[in-house]
Design a protein with these regions (language model features):
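Divalent metal-coordination and catalytic microenvironments
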Residues: 16, 69, 78, 112, ...
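Mid-to-C-terminal alpha-helical segments outside catalytic/metal-binding sites
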Residues: 1-15, 22-69, 77, 130, ...
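Histidine-centered catalytic micro-motifs
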Residues: 12-22, 176-180, 211
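Catalytic pocket-lining loop regions of alpha/beta-barrel enzymes
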Residues: 138-139, 153-268, 296-299, 304, ...
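Short aromatic-enriched loop/helix-cap "lid" or pocket-rim segments at secondary-structure transitions
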Residues: 23-29, 92, 125, 152-154, ...
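Active-site environment of divalent metal-dependent phosphoester hydrolases
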Residues: 18-23, 85-88, 118-120, 146-149, ...
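Active-site gating/metal-coordination segments in enzymes
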Residues: 77-191
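Alpha-helical scaffolding within the catalytic cores
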Residues: 60-67, 94-100, 124-128, 194-197, ...
Length: 345
């Protein structure tokens, strides 16, 4: 929890964290190298004291995450929202097994989402059903610009995507996290276009579409979609990290989101290990909108910040907002054997 200067406790859910492997050993081709190096360039938007050496950034440890998220980062609950990138990395950029093992170490503080790719068609649907039965996923992370063979991306409105979305809903997955934000080299910017969210949100109103990175650089497109679709949410990861190097720009982003969506549909995420939650949360809690922006959209308040930092995501995932959780508390779940083999990809 974050404690304000007045002593008030703020419950924090980091809705977008990663354990990735961008090591030289795991890189399959030049595209994998380009991807992790582009990630590292984004990482350098951090305050200097939070910038890691490149080799550590390529593959950090479970202990790094525990320290940066739970011990130092004010986070009470964290949610893995990974990407696979099987065409770039031998064993995937993110590992289901590694994420699940970490979740089992901290079952009262971690939710591990996974992914699906509609280009896997029927085989992927069967894999989804098996995995939901085994792992009980509450959400998925979709990466519409991911390369697969000759394909350089897909759309939420593709026929197979609709089948996956409908099956997800039938299986009890309600939270659909979609990367609709800045492009990472070598992926294509247009494949992350936010426009396809509009139709699926209208036709599948019982699903929650969390648009990660709030559609940047297409913020206006996103806000006008979200204004008319009550099941569309803004994920602040990436955008909120601009609070350090581009505070005015971030103030413009958050003021637009508050005006069009309201504070109940904005969700905090650090995108760790792109950035660490500690400095982001500290700067966000100190944020006051410039007078000219506040005159149009209103000032951001403590109650709004409480909703954004934890209460909104807790509501979507049925997380109890209560007393602070202490790092290293007893595990309440017996370990299970991990699934062998790679996902369908």
């Amino acid at each position: 929890m974050f404690t304000t200067k007045s002593g008030e406790k703020i419950f924090v859910v980091d809705g977008h964290v990663h354990l990735w492997d961008g090591s030289d050993k795991n890189i399959k081709n030049r595209y994998g190298e380009e991807f992790i190096k582009c990630f590292y360039d984004y990482h350098k938007l951090s305050p200097k004291e939070y910038v890691w050496p490149y080799k550590k950034y390529q593959k950090y440890t479970d202990e790094d995450l525990e320290q940066d998220i739970f011990q130092n980062g004010y986070v009470d609950f964290a949610i893995f929202n990974p990407q696979y990138l099987g065409d770039f990395y031998h064993h995937g950029f993110s590992s289901l097994e590694r994420n699940e093992a970490f979740r089992k170490k901290h079952p009262d503080r971690v939710i591990a989402n996974w992914f699906w790719d509609p280009r896997n068609e029927e085989a992927g649907l069967k894999q989804l059903e098996q995995d939901v039965e085994k792992y009980g996923w509450k959400g998925v992370k979709l990466y519409t610009a991911e390369w697969k063979g000759d394909s350089k991306g897909w759309k939420l409105t593709d026929p197979w995507s609709y089948r996956y979305l409908q099956r997800s809903q039938e299986l009890g997955i309600k939270n659909i996290h979609v990367h609709k934000g800045p492009t990472i080299r070598p992926l294509n910017k247009d494949a992350f276009d936010v426009g396809d969210v509009d139709e699926v949100a209208s036709l599948l109103p019982d699903l929650n579409f969390i648009v990660e990175h709030c559609g940047l650089p297409r913020l206006n497109d996103f806000t006008f979609i979200a204004a008319q679709e009550p099941n569309v949410y803004a994920g602040l990861s990436v955008a909120i990290a601009l609070i350090h190097t581009r505070p005015r720009y971030f103030s413009e982003i958050i003021s637009e989101l508050l005006f069009w969506l309201g504070p109940e549909r904005i969700l905090f995420g650090s995108d760790y290990a792109l950035w660490q939650p500690k400095w982001i949360i500290e700067k966000f809690m100190d944020l006051e909108l410039p007078e000219d922006l506040a005159a149009e959209t209103g000032q951001i308040t403590l109650e709004m910040k409480k909703k954004i930092l934890g209460e909104n995501t807790a509501r979507l995932y049925n997380i109890s907002v209560g007393e602070p959780k202490h790092f290293g508390s007893a595990v309440s779940e017996a370990p299970e054997p991990l699934r062998k083999g790679a996902p369908v990809a």
